[in-house]
Amino acid sequence: MRAMIDANGDAARTSGARIVHACGHDSIPSDLGVQFLQEAAIGRFGVPCRRVTTRITRMKGGFSGGTAATFLNAMKLRKEDPGFDTVSGDPYALCPAGDRDGPEGPDRMMPVSVTWDADLEAWTKPYFMASVNAKVVRRSNALMGYPWGRNFRYDETALTRGGVGGWWADMRYALFGRGLLIAMAIPVTQRLLIRHVLPKSGEGPPAQLRETGVYEVIQVGELPDGTILKAKVTGQGDPGVEPTTRMLTEAALCLAQDESRMKVGGGFWTPASAFAALLRDRITAHAGLSFELNEAGGVRVVPTGPRSGRADEDGVKQAAGAATVPPAP
């Protein structure tokens, strides 16, 4: 993404072309989910959450050949590009030039770390796509003019359970994930994995698993006064297959059919900065996703509505509860 933005960003802005990255399972639940939670916080309390954590609480799906090919390509790029590790480890690598700093520490794809989540009272383990999703969320905040503040913090992991059993299960997963990455980086073991373990390009999970797959994420936001707000994003189907296809389709239709209601001009965008409620409403209606706000006494769906207006890539300014948008270039 960083390479594409650097190479073609000026041309996209000049031509008016809108290119939106990360419109599948990575990173729509994270990106649009955080935006949904922050809009609820601003609407209810007048201020955004200073910190949001995303916890993957359910994930049932298979491992496809396309996913394997993506990891193998990342290993290849790491060898060929001396700056690859620097970019992948920089939590603000996808933010516009001049905005690539903040309070977060380095991103790591699969750290050997298990942490306790005091908000949800359970152990968490590394989630292998978290470093990408987190960069997209931070880029959204920057592109929209920092509606969540320049000191906004974001963290994403997978959630299991409490107790010693939960800690041990998470630690085994973390060690296995780290070991797999090391094995994929060594030529001999990489060849063995490709030949005997990893699915081939075009291969994927069986139909039954694709249809019965499910995923759920809980997002916890902390306001400046310590108030906690929680939201939930759920979806049906293997997240990397049919739901991703539906999300990509709805994103394309949003670009084609909702142009007059989009508030951005040409450039490279994220789902939240380009589409916001327009895409949330589409994928809720047609892609099997739901965005829910957890409240005392139950969970209720918060309706979202379309927005209007346009701006250039670096010009969207959003204050608490309202957006001020300069004219399109």
Feature-to-residue mapping (PLM):
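C-terminal catalytic/substrate-binding lobe primarily of soluble NAD(P)-dependent oxidoreductases
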Residues: 13-18, 27-28, 35-329
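Short glycine/serine/threonine-rich phosphate/pyrophosphate-binding segments
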Residues: 2-4, 26-33
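Rossmann-fold NAD(P)-binding glycine/threonine-rich loop
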Residues: 1-17
